[in-house]
Amino acid sequence: MVKLMEVYEGKAKKMIPIDDDKLIMEFKDDATAFDGTKKARFKGKGWLNAQLSVIFFKLLEEHGIKTHFIGVAGGNRLIVEKLDMYPLEVVVRNVVAGSLKKRLPLPEGYELPEPIVELYYKNDELHDPMINYYHAKVLGISLDEIKKIEEIALKVNEILKDYLAKKGIILVDFKLEFGKDKNGDIVLADEISPDTCRFWDAKTKRSLDKDVFRFDKGDLIEAYKEIYERITGEKPEF
């Protein structure tokens, strides 16, 4: 009997099983904001996010960070390792922006003296609430696992922040997801792209990420292209 493998489709990506160990991660051209209430499609967005994720995953692997990236299966498709995912979104913040403005009496653009790490329970029905170590324990995630996840997240931040600074880009904040591999090791998953990071131009503080779409600041594809061109020195191929 042929074993049917479930395809999972989210707002921005589609996960297509290859076998028991690998998946195709297909990046879509869809953009959403405000819990999916604002939607649009942008030709080339999926390609740009896929290619930028490849660059960042390779960079992190070079610095000893284990990621789920295996290879490229096409312009907007990556081959990734199948993991047992944690129901967490891990946010690292270097600069006050977004929802942090509502929780701290500090102005937007304030550079934090050290990074802030936040944990969110990944659940659409509950709108991804912020949680702490105690909540994580109830969800079956041990303190040791959380500490390891935070340690990796901070190392990722250090690597990406320094790399992007050389390209004239401020890494304001970003979201990461993690899973466990077959050996029980914690592995970085999902994507690293302008969809999941806040990037600002170092001189003008201009947004070069999904905030361009979220707050109608300009042309989303032009912003994503600019990130790609600054990092690679090349024009995108889509």
From Swiss-Prot:
Under NCBIfam families, the record lists: purC
**Family the entry assigns:** Belongs to the SAICAR synthetase family.
Q: CDD domains, from UniProt? A: SAICAR_synt_PurC
In its UniProt entry, the species of origin is given as Pyrococcus horikoshii (strain ATCC 700860 / DSM 12428 / JCM 9974 / NBRC 100139 / OT-3)
Q: Name one GO biological process term.
A: 'de novo' IMP biosynthetic process
Q: Which reaction does it catalyse?
A: 5-amino-1-(5-phospho-D-ribosyl)imidazole-4-carboxylate + L-aspartate + ATP = (2S)-2-[5-amino-1-(5-phospho-beta-D-ribosyl)imidazole-4-carboxamido]succinate + ADP + phosphate + 2 H(+)
Question: Is the keyword Repeat assigned to this protein?
Answer: no
The pathway that the record names for this protein is: Purine metabolism; IMP biosynthesis via de novo pathway; 5-amino-1-(5-phospho-D-ribosyl)imidazole-4-carboxamide from 5-amino-1-(5-phospho-D-ribosyl)imidazole-4-carboxylate: step 1/2
Root EC class: ligase
What protein does this entry describe?
Phosphoribosylaminoimidazole-succinocarboxamide synthase
Q: What is its EC number?
A: 6.3.2.6
Pfam families cross-referenced by the UniProt entry = SAICAR_synt
**What GO MF annotations does this protein's record show?**
ATP binding; phosphoribosylaminoimidazolesuccinocarboxamide synthase activity
Keywords in alphabetical order, please.
ATP-binding, Ligase, Nucleotide-binding, Purine biosynthesis
